[in-house]
């Protein structure tokens, strides 16, 4: 009898505790989706210190680079020809409706000034400019929407635990520390 009671209790707990409410999007969410569908044309910019290696944002893992050595790229990151106004003008003149910018990818390097980490374009590079701020100001001035891609995966953090193939073979221990 005791086993039946415990089994029934566990069953009911699992059934009722794991039930999720059906997602109902807000009107704002639906309106934003419709806007995005209708926009049809925009620019997605993947740009960060990985660009210095003439490779994509996964270069750290794909090429099994040492994470500590990869961090040193920030010391030489100086995009002297960056011009937010020019980028936005080109996008607008081409008929684009938005720009989506990679504010931070898995390498943990932020393309904006943040108090959460010194590993960012303002504090860790000789460039010392907040390109996100400049891009936001240029987009606002020309009436172009701006969206951000921000990765929660962060190979730079010592407490990051590598899931799947991300962050492996980069000089870190299996626990991510």
Locations of the language-model features?
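Bacterial Sec-dependent N-terminal signal peptides
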Residues: 1-21
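Mature catalytic domains of secreted/periplasmic carbohydrate-active enzymes
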Residues: 20-177
